[in-house]
Amino acid sequence: MRLPFKFSAALGLGLPLVLCSFGIGSRVARADTWNLPSPINDSNTSVSFVVDSTFSTINGTTKDLFGSISLKDRKDPLSIVVDLAIKVKTIDTDWDDRDETLQECMASDQFPTVSFISQRLSDNCKPTLIDISKRCSGTLTGILTIRDVTKEVTLPVEISKEADSYRIKGTLPLQWADYNIEDPSILIVQLDRTANISYETVVPLKH
């Protein structure tokens, strides 16, 4: 069974993962732009994962997230660049032996981070539209790198406007084998082959 990484980047994946939750605000008093750039860290972003196993559901978290959210083109509100990195050795499933096994399968010494760099937000999530509907469900296209594998992924995104921020979250299912990750199952405890990465992040409307 595979780990649902929960990019409660509360982005990216970077992804990835998340990949595996983020908010965006408006820098000026216009509804056609975001309040960017904005940093990504543990105070505004979280990445977590859920893994189904033979006997139970395994929940995991990450920490020491770092990165940023910016616009490639200030005139294009869809040109969002989420640059998120997750340290593999911060993965915590509340069981040291299991954490070590997972980190070994991900070759954490050789590939210490999981990264996600976004390229484009879907058209239906323009800030002008969100200001009217207060929310949107769209996608964020980007590049996810895990171990020695880099793939373009389409990250599901839900953006909601709150009193003083935009909250962004979503979940991305991944196959272990697609990223050259050996089956991290321990002894008779089997993990699902699909990992669901969830993220959430929040960025204030104003600095």
What does each model-found stretch correspond to?
Residues 12-23:
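Bacterial N-terminal signal peptides
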Residues 2, 14, 35-37:
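Selective for proline/serine-rich intrinsically disordered segments
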Residues 1-7:
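N-terminal secretory signal peptides that target proteins for export/translocation
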Residues 27-207:
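Low-complexity, acidic/polar, glycine-enriched regions of mature
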Residues 11-12, 31:
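Short stretches within intrinsically disordered, low-complexity N-terminal or propeptide regions
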